[in-house]
Amino acid sequence: MKLITNKQGLVGNITVPGDKSMSHRSIMFGAIAEGKTVIRHFLRADDCLGTIKAFKALGVKIEETDEEIIVHGTGFDGLKQADGPLDIGNSGTTIRLMMGILAGRDFDTVILGDESIAKRPMNRVMLPLQEMGAKMHGKDGSEFAPITILGKQSLKRVEYHMPVASAQVKSAIIFAALQADGETIIHEKEKTRDHTEHMIRQFGGEIEMDGLTIRVKGGQKFIGQEMTVPGDVSSAAFFIVAGLIMPNSEIELTHVGLNPTRTGIFDVVEQMGGSLVVKDSSRSTGKLAGTVVVKSSELKGTEIGGDIIPRLIDEIPVIALLATQAEGTTIIKDAAELKVKETNRIDAVATELNKMGADITPTEDGLIIRGKTPLHAANVTSYGDHRIGMMLQIAALLVEDGDVELDRAEAVSVSYPTFFEDIRSLLK
């Protein structure tokens, strides 16, 4: 696909799609709650539609209208054995959280996905669930999908110290803990996104959060809710960076989720001297949301590492692009988790942006980016990774000497089906 290039400014207003993490979880909680859950501003992208498909296969009645998703939940015990394997496509969130949900059911399930899912590590989820009494295994006894979950297991409480900072692993343990005897205690390595914890409370459940320690009791019942999903800050990030690096630009992003566990990119933009203002913030069904305004800015390099990394892990590809347009060196470290995303994002970012003229050195746990560098025409690939694909389109906007051809552009639909349309709507 030929990308949009050689543009002199982006001006206008965008409402980014619903938050991907929250859209997944809204379906999951709606399914295990009792009664009707109505979800507005749901992300109708491949990953989240895959979660709907999976729960329909498990016997949950889900209606889809133009404005709403309506889930008719009948509790954990209302889930039924699927007729065949659950195919969750490209969604790591779906497979890992479903492992926790299905660990305590009284039927067997096989979960599989695409070629990317088949390469992603699942021991990080299987090991704590097995400690709780779950029985599951990967293909040929490995840790890789397809994952077979054996039903009719009694789950027991566990006190678990997480070896990696992962909201997906934490959430899988929480879903299993809701079906276990007693109180499960989870100690996080670093604070990660806490949508699952907040949604437990939103759906009428109880959970204790004290710093990095989480306590959750089994046997809880949930009640269906009405909710509006805020805009996804990870999707907004592409327009935040575009507005900062494109000359003569000012972009307003409305109804963006402002959960502090997700807004690390705001802190980085401030460190780099970028113009970013948050206004009109309000609580949307328990979640903070607001309008984010960005303008063209002169940027300087910075160092990014430590406990901020889980707050911006999905934004690092586009933050790396931002750093190519900053004066000086930017160092990103403590981000080895990027190697086990949809692709090895450390290598993918360095390889593809360097093709375009950037000066980036990949490291074991991050990137060293030397700026400021002009970007040039090139043939690039997304590797089938939606965030790499969208980052490369933002990079292409700066190119003045020819075309940028993106291979596997269709990956963008995983999280942002209208991305290219929204870019065009901002062109002067």
Curated annotation (Swiss-Prot):
Keywords in alphabetical order: Amino-acid biosynthesis, Aromatic amino acid biosynthesis, Cytoplasm, Transferase
Subunit organization: Monomer.
The EC number(s) this enzyme carries: 2.5.1.19
Catalytic activity annotation: 3-phosphoshikimate + phosphoenolpyruvate = 5-O-(1-carboxyvinyl)-3-phosphoshikimate + phosphate
GO CC field: cytoplasm
Residues given in the record as 3-phosphoshikimate binding sites: 20-21, 25, 166, 168, 314, 341
Cellular location(s): Cytoplasm
Protein name: 3-phosphoshikimate 1-carboxyvinyltransferase
GO biological process: amino acid biosynthetic process; aromatic amino acid family biosynthetic process; chorismate biosynthetic process
